[in-house]
């Protein structure tokens, strides 16, 4: 289950609700329940993962986001999230979330850990923008290890929007 090391005491009720919702989304991602994750997204949400690797993307719409989450799930099985820092602010109609997160998993049979910064914009509780800034050097090394271990998808280029 996704965990939060950061304290959320002393913050507004809206921020505490945002933190619980965020953790539920990470927990769903841990279990591969990407439909549940996408229920938290607005229909035209934009996901930006800054990278030249297989996880790199600038996508919008639930169908393309599902493709990204499915690839993420295949490349990082048995993932676990730990939120180290969490900040939420703004009214429910224009809320911003920033989180510093650690992912632990297995890459080609060896323990793997990476950190990323996660920035979300929500409108009325739905994610409209999801920006992920990950330790790209660590992920690029992991991608090469995955490809060498028989996961050719790890060597593929970033996802492009599906043709309409």
Predicted regions and their residues:
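C-terminal and inter-domain tail/linker signature
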Residues: 2-164
């Amino acid at each position: 289950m996704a965990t939060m090391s950061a304290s959320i005491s002393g913050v507004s009720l809206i921020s505490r609700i945002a933190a619980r919702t965020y953790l539920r989304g990470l927990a769903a991602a841990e279990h591969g329940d990407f439909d549940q994750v996408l229920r938290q997204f607005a229909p035209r949400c934009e996901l930006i993962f800054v990278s030249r690797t297989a996880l790199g993307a600038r996508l919008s719409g639930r169908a393309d986001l599902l493709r990204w989450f499915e690839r993420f799930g295949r490349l990082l099985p048995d993932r676990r999230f730990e939120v180290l820092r969490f900040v939420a602010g703004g009214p429910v109609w224009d809320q911003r979330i920033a989180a510093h997160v650690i992912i632990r998993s297995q890459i080609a049979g060896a323990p793997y850990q990476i950190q990323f910064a996660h920035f979300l914009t929500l409108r009325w509780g739905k994610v409209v923008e999801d920006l992920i800034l990950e330790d790209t050097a660590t992920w690029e090394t992991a991608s090469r290890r995955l490809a060498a271990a028989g996961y050719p998808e790890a060597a593929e280029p970033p996802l492009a929007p599906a043709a309409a």
